[in-house]
Amino acid sequence: MTLWINGDWVTGQGALRVKRNPVSGEVLWQGNDADAAQVGQACRAARAAFPRWARLSFGDRQVRVERFAGLLESNKAELTAIIARETGKPRWEAATEVTAMINKIAISIKAYHIRTGEQRSEMPDGAASLRHRPHGVLAVFGPYNFPGHLPNGHIVPALLAGNTIIFKPSELTPWSGEAVMRLWQQAGLPPGVLNLVQGGRETGQALSALEDLDGLLFTGSANTGYQLHRQLSGQPEKILALEMGGNNPLIIDEVADIDAAVHLTIQSAFVTAGQRCTCARRLLLKSGAQGDAFLARLVAVSQRLTPGKWDDEPQPFIGGLISDQAAQQVVTAWQQLEAMGGRPLLAPCLLQAGTSLLTPGIIEMTGVAGVPDEEVFGPLLRVWRYDNFDEAIRMANNTRFGLSCGLVSPAREKFDQLLLEARAGIVNWNKPLTGAASTAPFGGIGASGNHRPSAWYAADYCAWPMASLESDSLTLPATLNPGLDFSDEVVR
């Protein structure tokens, strides 16, 4: 039984789904998808649970959420292993994901009060108050690259605000989704407050098509995000928060420490096997001898990055991609870039056929026309050379996306210029593109989102504002507007 609906674990009535380790092929999880009827049941359960959950005090909801944080802590080793085995990422990285999930609780509580708490301003004849109210029933679509942390970034603030939820994990990480839901069950959530439906496209379409949804929170690809945006068009009553990908540029200016710059670039482009939405996809490198030296060093160090299994010792920097199909898509993208005229610097290589262990790829595209403005979700870095910083910024902005952008340079004035001209929601200076703070908003512009950033700003899309003018007594004003006569004289 792999679906959690109205507090009960039930068997899906849809197609059988089997999840295997992307490197070894070991069967990790199997269960049946939720069919459309079960998705409807989950929605009705969430709707029925909403009034009581929303009427609880914030403190009562906070107790359950903090109990979940404690369960994450006590089950950290087990959940780390589940995430690592299912995604293929190394154990060390899965552990950092669980730690981020734990830290998210306190951050979300603080964000709730600062972003969407209550405010009161005294007035001469009363007060003006601001409160926030939950939307109702929200659908949460989770991604596979961080199957615990990223859905958690929607679920926790939504629950704190008083919403009820239907959660659909990625069909590529059902085991992680189920494991997290079982911890929520132990935390004592009332039946129907949080529901789990497993499945792929058909389940997702049934969920997003529900008429009784009050909103949908999504993290994933731009293609799917656009489909959801079109599907919910003409329904302004539903909140839609989209966090999508990017074709992210990293600008390398003059650097004093080449190895430090190479380390930052590798962290930006290849961590999580390139499967982070903020990963650098485009390296913009200044022309000249120093740029040549940097590029040679980057290729040499990247060549020594050998992907490994989730439990290898010593631990590898990167593991496998989410599937062998995903790895093959990166290889295909590389081949297409080379056929367009790209100059190969480091070819990606599958270490073993039928697995997702893929070495990084680097290819120079300077002077090549018609390069697709698409996100290749894997360890593939394209390089362009530039002559001056104004050109670098123009190249950085030459994308329909706008998630992250970074600069490696000792010059503060160049970063200040980038801050003014960059079109990206995250702009870093001498820090990896993949570095983000939960105490800041996380999101982008253009094809990277719909102006509903998550992380610190997740509280904003989990509640709506209610403004009130209030007075505990009613008296006739001392001065009346012109034309109003409350005298006792009879008008004839």
Swiss-Prot record:
Domain of life of the source: Bacteria
EC number: 1.2.1.71
Transmembrane segments: none
Entry keywords, A to Z: Arginine metabolism, NAD, Oxidoreductase
Cross-referenced Pfam families: Aldedh
Active site, renumbered: E243, C277
GO BP: any one term: arginine catabolic process to glutamate
Residues annotated as binding NAD(+): G220, S221, A222, N223, T224, G225
Alphabetized PROSITE patterns for the sequence: ALDEHYDE_DEHYDR_CYS (PS00070), ALDEHYDE_DEHYDR_GLU (PS00687)
A GO molecular-function descriptor: aldehyde dehydrogenase [NAD(P)+] activity
InterPro entries (alphabetical): Ald_DH/histidinol_DH, Ald_DH_C, Ald_DH_CS_CYS, Ald_DH_CS_GLU, Ald_DH_N, Aldehyde_DH_dom, SuccinylGlu_semiald_DH_AstD
Gene3D superfamilies registered for this protein in UniProt: Aldehyde Dehydrogenase, Chain A, domain 1 (3.40.605.10), Aldehyde Dehydrogenase, Chain A, domain 2 (3.40.309.10)
Pathway involvement of the protein, from the record: Amino-acid degradation; L-arginine degradation via AST pathway; L-glutamate and succinate from L-arginine: step 4/5
Keyword NAD: yes
Catalyzed reactions: N-succinyl-L-glutamate 5-semialdehyde + NAD(+) + H2O = N-succinyl-L-glutamate + NADH + 2 H(+)
NCBIfam families: arg_catab_astD, PRK09457.1
Job description of the protein: Catalyzes the NAD-dependent reduction of succinylglutamate semialdehyde into succinylglutamate.
Family stated for the protein in its record: Belongs to the aldehyde dehydrogenase family. AstD subfamily.
Protein name: N-succinylglutamate 5-semialdehyde dehydrogenase
Organism: Escherichia coli O17:K52:H18 (strain UMN026 / ExPEC)
